[in-house]
Amino acid sequence: MSKIKNDKRETGHLKSPPETPLLNRVRFPSDLKQIPEEDLPQLAEELRAEMIDAVSQTGGHLGAGLGVVELTVALHYIFDTPHDRLIWDVGHQAYPHKILTGRRDRIRTLRQEDGLSGFTKRSESEYDPFGAAHSSTSISAGLGMAVARELSGGQRHVIAVIGDGALSAGMAYEAMNNAGALDARLIVILNDNDMSIAPPTGAMSTYLARLASGRAYRGIRDVGKKLTSHLGKSFDRAITRAVEHARGFVTGGTLFEEMGFFHIGPIDGHDLEALVPVLRNVRDNGTGPVLIHVVTQKGKGYPPAEAAADKYHGVAKFDVITGAQAKSPAGAPSYTKVFAQALVQEAREDKRIVAITAAMPSGTGLDLFEKEFPDRSFDVGIAEQHAVTFAAGLATEGYRPFAAIYSTFLQRAYDQVVHDVAIQNLPVRFAIDRAGFVGADGATHCGAFDVAYLATLPNMVVMAAADEAELKHMVRTAADHDEGPIAFRYPRGEGTGVPLPQRGEILKIGKGRIVREGSKIALLSLGTRLADCMIAAEELEAAGLSTTVADARFAKPLDADLIRRLAREHEVLVTVEEGSIGGFGAHVLHFLAHEGLLENGLKVRPLVMPDIFMDQAKPEKMYAKAGLDAAGIVKTVFAALGQAEQAARA
């Protein structure tokens, strides 16, 4: 067991990094294989202590990683990574994996600028054969690798670790169905950390799992294949049925077996004496796809996380001894909270309002809605495609559905947005959280593309909130809009602190607002860059450049009158948005070109997120790097005017 020394940390409690004598001998999985098997439980305890200490300093995903410590040790002990491919679904449980694969010396840089990613990442390590952060992709990727191995005549194993929550997404079943049809050799580890499928039943379950993974039991399947080869394909169905019937006497049939997987388990995912022999047997025996059902506990080994798994899924920095998480200084309410409270307020007035989330009730704020309206709140699981079409179905019957989905996750349901909502002009309301840069979660969670992929659709209305008061207006506007689909986007984090109206106002569709009058420079903002535009306007004014600032509010439909006025009355027009190329600025440029407003010397400069996937950092640093802060806006204006010296100083 690891020990805690006494030493002062910034929390004021006495503690220091844990003692990890066995773990200190392991830099890579090849070192792990030199540890005697009977010492693996101690190594796992040291690995767990190291992870707790690291995440206490960085924040991040804690519970999931603690739940797979023993599984991680066993997988790297038995399989020959990186030659064997080990894929972690989502990747937020991969912190122990990172520690064992040459990244321990950087583990306290998790999710920091220039540090380790909070997820698996191909460019970070050869031990990460497939990057992840969105769920339910591992089996598909693993199957692709397994088929590539067969095509090239290789011998490596491919292992995909997927959680029971991720199995709520259809993609996982599509991959399993394909794997079964191909009869490809693929090992899937089902990490069941909610005991939502079936718990283990003690020693007998472990015995059956160990037996089922060995040669004798797998022989039933092999016998069936040999009979088929001798008797011909006409007998294949009858033989398969007989084999499955024989196996059913031992463990019973399962959905996984119906898909063509050999099913082992459930087994205790924290018992290395059970895990290691089963994984060894699976490694050394059989062909075709196999699923090992492992039951684990989120937060295992850290009492605060065991007692409140939901609160310790993703954590801020925390005190290891007490479990108390660091709290940010009290400030303005978060955009997420303002959205949720505004939606609850509207739902009190309108029984047709229903709320839908795809496994993110807390992240989207809909847990507040669910408390007051449990019968009108729907968590559909990690199933964004279903969420959107489910909302469309509700809309056909006169309800007013709000689908609250992160920008990055709505990408998973784009065809449903197009085919099931926009083409049919159904009034589904999309509350798009985490718009723009999101900080520590990096490129995989960045909300860069929603304006570009939504504003191109006929019938769609797209709004972006400049502050939390505007967000309340947009919730009310969306609730009132029955003419077709409507979306509104807002960022992660706290609002600006502006006074909130008692209730939001219904905005006129396609109309923006002037928030500052000027005569030479026009800054047209979509979203929360408005605050930086106001700061930039002050700096430009001080330099003798009278500046107008406008809040577009709508990316679609555009406020044509506002844009015409800004173009005709100013020398420079800068559009500013928290999105990719092809979004709001592109629509404005298209409009200006079509109207002939680019032919009279107007200097237009669209400011967008750079055409790269930016790694994690603090959001304010990311916006500065992208040139989307006040300094970047000022620099752009000076450059447009040909004032290179001033631009360089900005």
Curated annotation (Swiss-Prot):
Any keyword Metal-binding?
yes
Catalytic activity from the UniProt record: D-glyceraldehyde 3-phosphate + pyruvate + H(+) = 1-deoxy-D-xylulose 5-phosphate + CO2
What GO molecular function annotations does the UniProt record carry, in alphabetical order?
A: 1-deoxy-D-xylulose-5-phosphate synthase activity; magnesium ion binding; thiamine pyrophosphate binding
InterPro entries associated with the record:
Dxylulose-5-P_synthase, THDP-binding, Transketo_C/PFOR_II, Transketolase-like_Pyr-bd, Transketolase_BS, Transketolase_C, Transketolase_CS
Share an example GO biological-process annotation for this protein: thiamine biosynthetic process
Q: Which cofactor does it need?
A: Mg(2+); thiamine diphosphate
* Regions of compositional bias (Basic and acidic residues) in chain numbering: 1-13
Q: Which CDD domains match?
A: TPP_DXS, TPP_PYR_DXS_TK_like
Q: Which domain of life is it from?
A: Bacteria
Q: How is the cofactor bound?
A: Binds 1 Mg(2+) ion per subunit. Binds 1 thiamine pyrophosphate per subunit.
Under which pathway is this protein filed?
Answer: Metabolic intermediate biosynthesis; 1-deoxy-D-xylulose 5-phosphate biosynthesis; 1-deoxy-D-xylulose 5-phosphate from D-glyceraldehyde 3-phosphate and pyruvate: step 1/1
User: Which positions in this protein are listed as binding Mg(2+)?
Assistant: 164, 193
Please report any disulfide bonds recorded for this protein chain, giving both cysteine positions: none
EC numbers listed for it are 2.2.1.7
Cite the residue spans of the region called Disordered.
Answer: 1-23
Instruction: List keywords of the entry alphabetically.
Output: Isoprene biosynthesis, Magnesium, Metal-binding, Thiamine biosynthesis, Thiamine pyrophosphate, Transferase
Which residues make up the binding site for thiamine diphosphate?
92, 133-135, 165-166, 193, 302, 384
Which NCBIfam families has this protein been placed in?
dxs, PRK05444.2-2
Protein function: Catalyzes the acyloin condensation reaction between C atoms 2 and 3 of pyruvate and glyceraldehyde 3-phosphate to yield 1-deoxy-D-xylulose-5-phosphate (DXP).
The subunit field of the Swiss-Prot or TrEMBL record says: Homodimer.
So what family is this one in?
Belongs to the transketolase family. DXPS subfamily.
Query: What name does this protein carry?
Result: 1-deoxy-D-xylulose-5-phosphate synthase
Q: Which organism is it from?
A: Chelativorans sp. (strain BNC1)
